[in-house]
């Protein structure tokens, strides 16, 4: 719908389109026009929606096409994705569209609503025919409502409601209300079929015309606003198109109005009659359904009567059997008569149930489907949902009734079963089988019931029923259908029935347990063994029987569902066990016991999943044993039976038929299996009995899963067998009685044998865990693979105690009631033996698991069993994490399978951490299972082992499970996450080894082929690039942006994409090669141990990285994959998920999916690189992968582009070799980064070691294609952002500027990355980046003033500096620093050219064309020439020819200068000196521009700086530039001493800061210093990267609120309402941290739309399934958007500063503040490795937040902070402004570019509200400035405090003094909280620096600029506190008005950059901060205080004092200290 397709209903009626157009000329025309023009309108509206979050925008967009333009997330939720978006659009003209809209609206309200209610003439309403007739009978009118909805965009009321209304129902309601009245009443068109002409009234058309005109006006105003705001030309074009379409629609409406005036409303009655007919049909259908329900009820009553009869017969049998109880218990044959009678009764009962229910099910299904379809149609088409609601309610009621009836039936059955149980306990051998069959049938029915109950959620929140419904979607669907037939019952009745069904299910479960026990007894071996354990476990079971039995009964359903889902496991097991009902009963008993045990130890979900998982395991185990005994026969039977049951399970009749035949065939096999099961169970029981209760929890959980697997399978077989029950049971029970006797002996023997076999298997597993895993995975094939899994399972039982757990489950279940006691009595001896054997097995398992090292081998085996049984085994894993998680897996088998691999992705990091812990616990002992039980009883066993097995199984079942993983790869989001756990890598090492050998050969071939192709493409690309470069950059990019046609860019982009894909594939192949070799190596080596290490490391490590992965759940977990990049690559991750594949995917798609895949994959394979990246950096990278968050959708492309860039880098910079080299380099860098990352590095290093073992270079090549991605690995945050930037850079970006900056940054980053590998290559990349920046510069050169050229030149300088620094090996810090610098330069260009949006767009478009280094180099040279000319001109004007310096200094001085020197003599500095001279010439204006250059433009920049890194770069660059400006100013200004001092101090501080930043942030920064690069310092001055830690804290704080909410709704489906509530919650939580300004509003709108779009993908999915991905998605989006927002805030502030010196001063202050923060944080960062990065991020926030605040407060305040801030950006201006330091006391409106452009206003709306309320737009209003200053002085002081806090660490000079001066300036109330802290901090540092500042101030006051510069620079590096603190308020004002408090908080947290970052991240607006500004002082108070401060500021002495502290801040603004008074004035 993004293309503006039809609404949701239109999608449904897509087939009808031709009918539409064929039905009538009008319809056809309408459709045609609707499709064609509306499509455009939709696009424009869609884009407009994207652009404008405003309701008016929405309205305009809605006017275009509320539904047709689903670009808005809301609309997307409405419109089915299957509906062709543009079909209708293309077919209809605008006038016809208007007509169609009217018709649609009329139809929606009249025809459609009625249709949904009643049968459509088209059959549309008929529930039964609903599906078919919808497509067949959908007539144009059907489309009309949808088209009308689409055309609603024309209709303001309709479109607005729809857009505003998230759900189509709401839209329809609004539509109905707005249109139905007019259209239906007035304009009901008789063309229900769309054949009649719309009979709309002229009044309606007139109203619509008015609406359209209103929309046109709105759209025009929006377009004007966009143009004014320098919005993207695309948006403007979209609005233009929208306006055009609206006008066309207006014309069409006019024409249509004319037509209508000429028409007769004769068709309205037709429509009405049709609607009435439809309603009548619907009513008839409802009556029919009710009759059917009644018939079903009668059937149920009959069944109940039969049940009673059976119960009576059973009672009779009980009488006869009571005497035989002993014999039956002892295995003595019971009279065959009782068995026959029971079998007959039970079979009859079940047959009757089947006869009654299964028929009802199809009818119900049809009815439910038809009703649901009708509802959907009516809902989607009909504006009013009320009618649909009744239908749904009716359906729900019917479902409830059905469920209640089923419950009643179940109750009767349960009563019968209880009777049977009592009898069966007496005659356990005879009755149990009959009752078993019955119970099996009952279970089948009950399962259906319970499943529906679960779906109905009427189960009273029964987790079990819900779970069962989730695990058994098919069964639950059937049951739901049945319930729908019965669903006409009242909800209360349904609830009652559900409760009854639940109780009866429990009873049935108990009975089933009993029967299973009896049948197990009949299978003597199983019974004895099981009963011993069952008595033990029955005690546990009895405790939880009530809850668990339901689960167990549903488990059969779950098993069937799982079987359906995992057609390999339960049903197959069931078929295997079908013959052996006893085995089934054993399994059922086991299920019971497992359920009970689970109930004890595990929540029902866990129990269920464990059951399901372990049922499979158990069945697999039984089959394993069976395989051991009769592996082939059982496998064949189980295969056929499983397949048949899986296939037939939905159709129970067929299943029963097939199962009957299979049961006959499986009887013998079941007997064998019974023997095997008896042996296994005995062995398992022996093993498991030993574990403590908690261990039993784990063991039971696992065993229960296994046994329940067999039990469920057997239950399924029972269901299947019920048809065969009579014959089979008679024969079977006769055989059973014999068998039981034989098997009792055999089981004992077999137990010994099995114990021996298990010991052997354990020994084999220990010896060859890989082989076991491979065998297990091989056995995980549909049947035999599953059986081999079983084969491994016995070993696993020992190893994983899964088999023993299975044994425990049967025993536990057999313990049920009297039967348990009789069995216990009978089997006390057996229990003793079993316990002893269990202890032995336990010891063996413990030893074996310990030997396996964390029981990884066993966990792989268990995983293989579960994965063999089904990938559902993940479910137990998930259930380990959450029982609800279990339903995640249960509801979506595939996703859960893979999620199960990943521990259900909940948060791979978190889950993995759990897994790691579990593994660690496992490593400590097998008894750790009890530890896992609480959260993952089975999950420890199941998740670890299951994951291992999964991965082994999936790899093994490359055809079956593993390839499904490939499918899941495509679904990569949810599945890959799980698969990407280390388990996948482990299994890939182990089991995939075999597959991989073949795949490796193929991959090698493919690799060679792809390498050749890549080389060819690279050559072609080079050729094309050269050609394009020649074309594009011939004359300094002489080609206008127009000339450089987008086609060329497109070609280049496509080439890059092709190359990237080829490179990516090649890298993947190479990675796979290496990984395969690694796997081949490690398989034999220590596949388990490395995995366990990786697990531990990745788990413990991912936990922190996955902090957002889980939140990103699908942001960046594999639903990280689901997130922009993550979830989209689910198929990718699974396919390449295994370490070899995984790294390749990891490198590629993890780039594309960077966070999801990377998060997931880091866990699996390269958690080292990716996990590190996965932490917040990963979300950050995901943000980078998202690139600009606006490019969420582009994220993958950007990632791909990043890959593409990498190929470019490779191709142009060393080709594929580089990736490997880079990989190696990345490893080292990654390790260094890891060391920087503290905890993550260790785990990531461990992973990295492991991954490097497997991937070697791949670990650093997580993004093999994109060295940047590898760089991501290097620097989790910066590298990630850089990688994303690089990827974005290569990706054609919607925002050319973004792309340019991205290119610059990404190329710089790539260069930085490559610099270590290939410095020369790095240079081309940098040149490429620079070239992009410079290409825009040449273009801009004309438009740009020298400032622009200088800015571009700075960009080039930074690029070269980046090149140099990257060449020097400061890769990432230089890279990021350069990227940030470049981006800030680009931002400056943008900010300087904000008035020239089109120029910027063209410029960046051209820059985008600079795809190759050659082009970039040419553009760079051209820009250099231009800049040199401009600089030389400016220098000549200044009397200095600094031109050579500009062109050469950045190249030479950067490399030549020491870090401190580079800071002083940075190219930027030289350039800035030139700038400065030029600026001096231009004077304050140039300074403003320069400052703005230094700062980042806000309007266009938000888009360009979509990448967080890009945005961050702006702040860093601003800081760096500010410092350089300060240096330049200091140097150029008259006060050479001051300049020298500033420069020296700044150099020292800059060097220290840069070194600190390098140390804290990353070695690359140090390398920057090593390769002394001013850019290094400039960007090393912690590139104002967003404080990822702060963002992490903030996002965590948000996610802390969201996660509980999601947990509350884990069982729910992600409805649009739920997603909307989540989105609103997130937005609310996010907004809580931000001030309300236009930019903030825009940001929140953007965030909301992005969240909506990102969350829309989860619509309709079970929250359990996608919750993790959802969280990851949300967290990723939040991270990206918040980072982007902060960067944008900085940009907005900076851009405003560009226009306003105050802003420049603020930016300068922000830069200094960033420097102070940087130095401080660097110092802190040195203490805390992430501190450097945090510094960047904090700077971002501090600048974004603090600078804004400072702008608002300090700019207004006449205090020194203004001067300080001014010093930063306006030090040049300080010469001018310091002269009048107070004179330029800009109000917030002035100081913030946002105020001028409106974005800043949104950001700091609160402040601005105050400021603007005081003097909304007054630029230099002293009162405003003072009031704002007071207000913001608090912020400033806070910010200053933050800076000082930072600076005290970095510079222990100014912090005390600044507070002092600030105290003088700031009113005491403002001071207290933060100033006191500042004073505390500053008093420490200030005493020293106070003198220097005071001295500086003294000189500054005379010449504020020089001194402020000196003081500022002196203070900025060292005393950044003063300057930064003083500037910081301004910087924060400019940088982060919205995030003041966080910055303030940072200030509060003195000398704790991390803490302050955390506070920033956690609290954008801290209570301390906000109250100081907002809460503590009202505007009036603030004004008063500001006035007071102004009065204080009036004092020159105070100003001097304050300027001593704050002089740097306001020095630019305050040219003269005396002006301080002027400011206050």
Curated annotation (Swiss-Prot):
Region of interest called Disordered, as start-end residue ranges on this chain: 1-91, 111-140, 354-390, 528-553, 565-586, 620-654, 866-885, 913-940, 1081-1105, 1149-1213, 1230-1310, 1319-1338, 1720-1943
Positions where N-acetylalanine occurs in the chain: 2
Residue ranges with Acidic residues bias: 531-540, 623-633, 1800-1816
Residue spans of biased composition, Low complexity class: 634-644
Chain positions found as Phosphoserine: 65, 68-69, 93, 110, 116, 119, 159, 370, 372, 384, 593, 644, 859, 864, 867, 870, 957, 974, 985, 988, 1182, 1185, 1228, 1254, 1257, 1259-1260, 1315, 1317, 1571, 1695, 1729, 1766, 1769, 1777, 1783, 1959, 1978
Modifications made to the protein after synthesis: Ubiquitinated. Undergoes monoubiquitination catalyzed by the E3 ubiquitin-protein ligase MIB1 in proliferating cells, preventing cilia formation. Monoubiquitination by MIB1 is inhibited in response to cellular stress, such as ultraviolet light (UV) radiation or heat shock, resulting in cilia formation initiation.
Highest taxon of source: Eukaryota
Compositionally biased region (Basic and acidic residues): 1086-1096, 1189-1198, 1756-1768
Main localization category: cytoplasm
Gene Ontology terms for molecular function: molecular adaptor activity
Coiled-coil portions: 218-301, 399-426, 492-518, 652-772, 822-856, 985-1017, 1061-1086
Localization: Cytoplasm, Cytoskeleton; Cytoplasm, Cytoskeleton, Microtubule organizing center, Centrosome; Cytoplasmic granule; Cytoplasm, Cytoskeleton, Microtubule organizing center, Centrosome, Centriolar satellite
Claim: Membrane is one of the keywords in the record: no
Family annotation (InterPro entries): PCM1_C, Pericentriolar_Pcm1
Modification type N6-acetyllysine: residues: 399
Keywords: Acetylation, Cell projection, Cilium biogenesis/degradation, Coiled coil, Cytoplasm, Cytoskeleton, Phosphoprotein, Ubl conjugation
Any one GO biological process: cilium assembly
This protein's GO CC annotations: apical part of cell; centriolar satellite; centriole; centrosome; ciliary basal body; ciliary transition zone; cytoplasm; cytosol
Biased segments, Polar residues type: 116-132, 369-385, 870-879, 1149-1169, 1268-1285, 1784-1798, 1818-1828, 1849-1858, 1879-1901, 1925-1934
Span list, region Mediates interaction with DZIP1: 2-1458
Chain positions found as Phosphothreonine: 857, 875, 1466
Tissue: Expressed in the hippocampus and dentate gyrus, the columnar epithelial cells of bronchioles, the olfactory epithelium, the pericardium and the inner segment of the retina.
Assembly: Self-associates. Interacts with BBS4, BBS8, CETN3, HAP1, NDE1, NDEL1, MAP1LC3B, GABARAPAL2, and GABARAP. Interacts with CEP131; the interaction increases in response to ultraviolet light (UV) radiation. Associates with microtubule; association to microtubule is reduced in response to cellular stress, such as ultraviolet light (UV) radiation or heat shock, in a process that requires p38 MAP kinase signaling. Interacts with C2CD3. Interacts with CFAP263. Interacts with SSX2IP. Interacts with CCDC13. Interacts with CEP290. Interacts with PARD6A.
Function: Required for centrosome assembly and function. Essential for the correct localization of several centrosomal proteins including CEP250, CETN3, PCNT and NEK2. Required to anchor microtubules to the centrosome. Also involved in cilium biogenesis by recruiting the BBSome, a ciliary protein complex involved in cilium biogenesis, to the centriolar satellites. Recruits the tubulin polyglutamylase complex (TPGC) to centriolar satellites.
Similarity field: Belongs to the PCM1 family.
Name of this protein: Pericentriolar material 1 protein
